[in-house]
Curated annotation (Swiss-Prot):
GO CC entries: cytoplasm; small ribosomal subunit
GO BP terms in the entry: ribosomal small subunit assembly; translation
Transmembrane parts of this sequence: none
Disulfide bridges in this chain: none
Annotated InterPro entries: Ribosomal_uS19, Ribosomal_uS19_bac-type, Ribosomal_uS19_CS, Ribosomal_uS19_SF
Gene Ontology MF terms in the entry: rRNA binding; structural constituent of ribosome
Short name of one Pfam family: Ribosomal_S19
Name of the protein in question: Small ribosomal subunit protein uS19
Role according to the record: Protein S19 forms a complex with S13 that binds strongly to the 16S ribosomal RNA.
Length: 94
């Protein structure tokens, strides 16, 4: 179920304050955040936001196509190492 349109998109307050301050100062620093739940706002376009994935911060350069998505969608939390390789003992007939 999607969020109600009358509420508007959720953006953590501390993150929006940093983005607005950088926009007014015309500054483009990397903003580190743990807020994966925040929605990408049009004011964030052009900024690089380092989103925490549980282990490290993944730099995400925000483009217009990302508006409306969550920041966590662009910082994967799981790494797939591949399925186990076939061994001689596993392929032997029983």
């Amino acid at each position: 179920m999607a969020r109600s349109t009358k509420k508007g998109p959720f953006i953590d307050g501390h993150l929006m304050v940093k983005i607005e301050a950088m926009n007014q100062a015309n500054d483009r620093k990397v903003v580190r955040t743990w807020s994966r739940r925040s929605t990408v706002h049009p004011d964030m376009v052009g900024h690089t936001i380092a989103v925490h994935n549980g282990k490290k911060f993944v730099p995400v350069y925000v483009t217009e196509n990302m508006v409306g998505h969550k920041l966590g969608e662009f910082a994967p939390t799981r790494t797939f190492k591949g399925h186990a390789a076939k061994t001689e003992s596993s392929s032997r007939a029983r």
